[in-house]
Amino acid sequence: MGGGNLNIEEIIEKVANGEIKFYQVEKYVNGDKRLATEIRRKALEKRLGIKLHHIGYYSIDPNELIGRNIENMIGVVQIPMGVAGPLKINGEYAKGEFYIPLATTEGALVASVNRGCSALTEAGGVVTTLIDDKMTRAPLIRCPNARRAREVAKWVEENLDYLQEKAVSKVTRHGKLRGVKPFIVGNNLYLRFEFETGDAMGMNMVTIASEEIMKVIEEEFPDVRYLALSGNLCVDKKPNAVNFILGRGKTVIAEAVVPRKIVEKKLKTTPELIAEVNYFKNLVGSAQAGSYGFNAHFANIVGAIFLATGQDEAQITEGAHGITIAEVTPDGDLYISITMPSLEIGTVGGGTRVPSQREALEIMGVAGGGDPPGINAKKFAEIVAGAVLAGELSLLAAIAAKHLARAHKMLGR
């Protein structure tokens, strides 16, 4: 029985005809979120005259997700997940051989990344280097004029420790304010705060902390007005130049030297052709297109890993930013690298709590918080970068060998 005098069928009927809203269902079933999920789905089936059998088939517990990861839940969407690897990584945090979980419906993608992993591992592995690690939020403050905006910006730059103590430490144990980059446009001040966020991707953390900072600034400067918690200079979930240049999340590089014999044997092409394709496709072609993605397909690998591991899928946008370099070494081998300026990932919080996504993180040995905090997310970043390099190498080789269409005919239909 449901809440009040209604039985389950009556609740379904009332949801289907709109008398009970989707978000109200839990109130009628004593807070049972699994039952509420079933009712919403059955009501939708009834209203639309369809069956949602596969959406209703799942193992995760709605009671653990509703109110944290999802609202108005009706079930799940299942995405096939494959694994590529092993990939040998010689990183500062990721050391050893790793398998890469990839959730995708694009045929040939996993096979291509797997081929890249095989070639790179045979070549001795990938060297990964973490260049920077920060999450940003850029509130917007309205000032009387540009000079006042400059004064406020200077005060903020000189009082980061004070703001950490009076604002940030009040709302987070893991967040650390490490810097700020002010932008002034007319009488508008955009403060691009930079935070350390441990193993969390950190958007919730830095958003809450930034709001506390705004309260302190308004107390210090009564003539300015905090207008928006995000002034779009963060920049979150949009293609942009700021993240490409200054970075956001993890800035990471993966590189390798692949001997000529491996390029010819495994990849069926030459270092010269791969370098030529990369230059005229990824660099010249991308420049002509006005793209921030000077690469072949970062987004394919980033997207598949994000979906598998519970990352914020909208941040695939920034993960697609980056540059691939390929050149022939003096010895005639292939040097190849990828630079990712804004890889926004975490191993705790958000979708990483979903059991299947947590298991995908466990495949790489990065589930949950690290000791010390932050080490798991850094390791994860190096693994992602290595996988992206594998994907770039394989696709560039396929294009150079004119095998791309053939591969998609075989595996992608």
UniProtKB/Swiss-Prot annotation:
Concerning CDD domains, the annotation shows: HMG-CoA_reductase_classI (cd00643)
What are this entry's molecular-function GO terms? hydroxymethylglutaryl-CoA reductase (NADPH) activity
Q: Which reaction does it catalyse?
A: (R)-mevalonate + 2 NADP(+) + CoA = (3S)-3-hydroxy-3-methylglutaryl-CoA + 2 NADPH + 2 H(+)
Short name of one Pfam family:
HMG-CoA_red
Keyword list, A-Z: Isoprene biosynthesis, NADP, Oxidoreductase
Q: Which pathway is this protein assigned to?
A: Metabolic intermediate biosynthesis; (R)-mevalonate biosynthesis; (R)-mevalonate from acetyl-CoA: step 3/3
| Function description | Converts HMG-CoA to mevalonate.
Identification of the protein by name: 3-hydroxy-3-methylglutaryl-coenzyme A reductase
Q: Which organism is it from?
A: Pyrococcus horikoshii (strain ATCC 700860 / DSM 12428 / JCM 9974 / NBRC 100139 / OT-3)
| Lineage, broadest ranks | Archaea, Methanobacteriati, Methanobacteriota, Thermococci, Thermococcales
